[in-house]
């Protein structure tokens, strides 16, 4: 950098699921000489491709993609580890003279990059955790509702079935009196990024139609077979990865709990609810410049607008 005070550029493209973030990100990267850093908590898993809508090699169009396929479905992973690894990747991208472009819809991952949070300072309480685990076993939805009352920002980002993270968020609150979403390291400044954030959005009904078509496409592409393969490889349905959208619903079909038609409808409903939670989370960000998809002819036009907005800024 030519000046000590100059901040390094960071471009973020986010928004709810099924809005075309991945395609737009690649097009922007082509225009600006960028590399993609995924901010999606499901794309980290190897072998989970169809249900996560993981960009294929063709989709990536030769653009480097990072933070994808980095762990097995049964490996533990958390936000703190994501931050450490993604920040190291961003540093290397900048050293190569390229623009780091963060693309994804996992709000906690994005938050971890643009804010300095202390993830371990709250400590743990084994007795409290066991109590919460027992309650979660009886009713994960009631536990999630409790979190929603004390920390709606975090609850909006977590599915009720993700009991491990729901329990951790409640544990932090009970130990500190503060929501985990408020945990910020005050002894150092925010990361030194010249930040530009864009959010893709569209009318709710149009988004829901997109979601339904996407689910139908996943089934046609072999989502059921993908889930069968994961189960045959020995990955437990109780893993956090296997509780992700698309996987838990197909497991319910495979074990006879739901018919295929029911499983597909439940997946569509759960994905719609997930998109709603994502929007609740992202509305907190004053930095986001929202781009309404209906106002553009296609993803290329959206990418052109984002590239135009970076001129003289990044």
Curated annotation (Swiss-Prot):
Sequence segments annotated as region (Interaction with substrate tRNA): 40-43
Keyword Metal-binding carried by entry: no
Cofactor: Mg(2+)
Domain of life: Bacteria
Keyword tags: ATP-binding, Magnesium, Nucleotide-binding, Transferase, tRNA processing
Top EC class, one word: transferase
Family from the record: Belongs to the IPP transferase family.
Annotated positions binding substrate: 17-22
Record-listed ATP binding positions: 15-22
Subunit structure: Monomer.
SUPFAM superfamilies xref list: P-loop containing nucleoside triphosphate hydrolases
Enzyme Commission identifier(s): 2.5.1.75
One family name in Pfam for this protein: IPPT
MF terms in GO: ATP binding; tRNA dimethylallyltransferase activity
Organism: Pelotomaculum thermopropionicum (strain DSM 13744 / JCM 10971 / SI)
GO BP term, example: tRNA modification
Stated role: Catalyzes the transfer of a dimethylallyl group onto the adenine at position 37 in tRNAs that read codons beginning with uridine, leading to the formation of N6-(dimethylallyl)adenosine (i(6)A).
Entry protein name: tRNA dimethylallyltransferase
Catalytic activity annotation: adenosine(37) in tRNA + dimethylallyl diphosphate = N(6)-dimethylallyladenosine(37) in tRNA + diphosphate
């Amino acid at each position: 950098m030519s000046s000590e005070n100059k901040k390094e550029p960071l471009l973020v493209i986010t928004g709810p699921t099924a809005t075309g973030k991945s395609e737009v990100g690649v097009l922007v990267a082509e225009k600006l000489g960028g590399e993609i850093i995924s901010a999606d908590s499901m794309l980290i898993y190897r072998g989970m491709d169809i249900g996560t809508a993981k960009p294929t090699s063709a989709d990536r169009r030769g653009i480097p993609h990072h933070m994808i396929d980095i762990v097995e479905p049964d490996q533990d992973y958390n936000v703190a580890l994501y931050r450490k690894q993604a920040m190291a990747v961003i540093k290397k991208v900048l050293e190569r003279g390229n623009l780091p472009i963060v693309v994804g819809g996992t709000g906690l991952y994005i938050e971890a990059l643009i804010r300095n949070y202390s993830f371990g300072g709250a400590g743990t309480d084994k007795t409290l955790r066991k109590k919460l685990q027992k309650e979660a076993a009886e009713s994960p939805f009631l536990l999630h509702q409790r979190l929603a009352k004390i920390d709606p920002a975090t609850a909006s980002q977590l599915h009720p079935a993700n009991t491990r993270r729901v329990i951790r968020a409640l544990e932090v609150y009970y130990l500190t009196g503060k929501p985990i979403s408020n945990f910020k390291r005050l002894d150092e400044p925010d990361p030194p990024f010249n930040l530009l954030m864009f959010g893709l959005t569209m009318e709710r009904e149009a988004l829901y139609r997109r979601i339904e078509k996407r689910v139908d496409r996943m089934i046609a592409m072999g989502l059921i077979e993908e889930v069968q393969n994961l189960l045959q490889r020995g990955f437990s349905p109780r893993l956090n990865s296997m509780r992700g959208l698309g996987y838990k619903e197909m497991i319910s079909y495979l074990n006879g709990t739901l018919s295929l038609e029911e499983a597909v409808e439940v997946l569509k409903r759960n994905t719609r609810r997930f998109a709603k939670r994502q929007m609740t989370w992202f509305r907190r960000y004053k930095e986001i410049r929202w781009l309404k998809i209906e106002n553009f002819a296609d993803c290329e036009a959206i990418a052109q607008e984002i590239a135009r907005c970076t001129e003289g800024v990044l």
